[in-house]
Amino acid sequence: MQIYIVGGAVRDELLGRPNADCDYVVVGATPETMLAQGFRPVGKDFPVFLHPNTHDEYALARTERKTGHGYHGFIFHAAADVTLEEDLARRDLTINAMAKAADGTLVDPFNGQQDLASKTLRHVGPAFAEDPVRILRIARFAARFSDFSVAPETLALMRSMVACGEVDHLVAERVWQELAKGLMEQKPSRMFEVLRDCGALARLLPEVDKLFGVPQRADYHPEIDTGIHTMMVIDQSARRTFTLPVRFAALTHDLGKAETPADILPRHIGHEERSVRLTEQLCARLRVPNDCRDLALLTARYHGNIHRAADLKASTIVTLFEKTDALRRPERFRQLLDACLCDFTGRLGWENRPYDSPQYLLGALAAVASLNAGEIAVACADKTKIPERIHAARVHAIKQLLDNPGEQPEQQ
């Protein structure tokens, strides 16, 4: 039997990029051969084995055949007579369809090295059209390799897949999985650019697609277009290496602007409430994890208040802290401020503009956190008024801070 390193590890080595994961393909072996050599089977749908010492995954060379719609509509054939080229032919992109032998020989039957040099994302063959997840994967690779372009024939094939309804059969969990990975790439806006270009964005994330072409006030948004603004915001979240919940909140914070009545454009009065509703809808459909959903909803609802923090009354700031559970969840509140920072700087010419709201609100939060709510409760004779007394004490603490800014408590 012959063992080859395949896929991303080969690609990244040629690009000079780090890659901690190695995928191995074994040609000329059977499951019995692997077991006899001490490998442990782990694959459910096709033969994958763990190396007895390194615990790396080794997959038998296999082919696949389409049997139905969507991601799960395949049957696999793995046998000793499946060749390396047959295994590589089922892969999505030419740059991922290369292998390296034990002696270092590069196996490149689909000219992946040439496409790396020309910075082209090109599908391997017609089997690409059988798996709609590959549309999402190409878009994700565009976000990772942001200076690569999609080959014209590949883009045409992606458009035909969308037109025939293949993407409509994608399961929610797989869409979210690829979306999350794309948001964590170097330039996530490229993912949405490619999805929009092939028509998949309108089918998978219509709430985001509808933002493009919606105008905003030029004095606050020199980039004008809400869709372009959203792309700038998610790229800001990537540039600052923020967490996935922050990046997802950056994507969804302005969804409500797509439903602003035409007669009040380019103003967007009440878009925060509309954004909350649309974000809830999107999160339910894609089964978004709770941490991402919750931060996205808070950002959609409160980003306007946070931008105006210096103009808010002390009582409004306290209400903001209470509504966002900032005292019990300070780390999440910081993430909320991170998302708002991306929104503020994700505007044409505003990328490096100072943004004072986070420091201002964290100072106010520290002042409120320094209060002893238990002591206030004990001192309150009428127990029904405890929440009211605590709220009033918090308002007073912030008023004192505003009157004496030099005496700001230390932030935790």
Swiss-Prot record:
**Amino acids binding Mg(2+):** 21, 23
An example Gene Ontology biological process: tRNA 3'-terminal CCA addition
Matches recorded under Pfam families: HD, PolyA_pol, PolyA_pol_RNAbd
Q: Which UniProt keywords apply?
A: ATP-binding, Hydrolase, Magnesium, Metal-binding, Multifunctional enzyme, Nickel, Nucleotide-binding, Nucleotidyltransferase, RNA repair, RNA-binding, Transferase, tRNA processing
Q: What is its EC number?
A: 2.7.7.72, 3.1.3.-, 3.1.4.-
State whether keyword Glycosyltransferase applies.
no
Instruction: Look up the record and name the cofactor or cofactors this protein needs.
Output: Mg(2+); Ni(2+)
Q: Name one GO molecular function term.
A: ATP binding
Which of this chain's residues are annotated to bind ATP?
8, 11, 91, 137, 140
Recorded catalytic activity of this chain's protein: a tRNA precursor + 2 CTP + ATP = a tRNA with a 3' CCA end + 3 diphosphate; a tRNA with a 3' CCA end + 2 CTP + ATP = a tRNA with a 3' CCACCA end + 3 diphosphate
| Highest taxon listed in the record's lineage | Bacteria
Give yes or no: UniProt keyword Metal-binding: yes
Q: Which InterPro entries match?
A: CCA_bact, HD_domain, NT_sf, PolA_pol_head_dom, PolyA_RNA-bd, tRNA_CCA-adding_enzyme
- Cofactor: bound how, per the entry note? Magnesium is required for nucleotidyltransferase activity. Nickel for phosphatase activity.
Q: Which residues form the HD domain?
A: 226-327
Which residues are the signal sequence here? none
The entry's CTP-binding residues are 8, 11, 91, 137, 140
Job description of the protein: Catalyzes the addition and repair of the essential 3'-terminal CCA sequence in tRNAs without using a nucleic acid template. Adds these three nucleotides in the order of C, C, and A to the tRNA nucleotide-73, using CTP and ATP as substrates and producing inorganic pyrophosphate. tRNA 3'-terminal CCA addition is required both for tRNA processing and repair. Also involved in tRNA surveillance by mediating tandem CCA addition to generate a CCACCA at the 3' terminus of unstable tRNAs. While stable tRNAs receive only 3'-terminal CCA, unstable tRNAs are marked with CCACCA and rapidly degraded.
Task: Read off the NCBIfam families from this record.
Answer: PRK10885.1
Describe its assembly.
Answer: Monomer. Can also form homodimers and oligomers.
| Family annotation (HAMAP family) | CCA_bact_type1, CCA_bact_type2
Q: What's in the domain note?
A: Comprises two domains: an N-terminal domain containing the nucleotidyltransferase activity and a C-terminal HD domain associated with both phosphodiesterase and phosphatase activities.
Task: Give any extra note attached to this record.
Answer: A single active site specifically recognizes both ATP and CTP and is responsible for their addition.
Q: Which family does it belong to?
A: Belongs to the tRNA nucleotidyltransferase/poly(A) polymerase family. Bacterial CCA-adding enzyme type 1 subfamily.
* UniProt name for this protein: Multifunctional CCA protein
What is the species listed in this Swiss-Prot or TrEMBL entry? Dechloromonas aromatica (strain RCB)
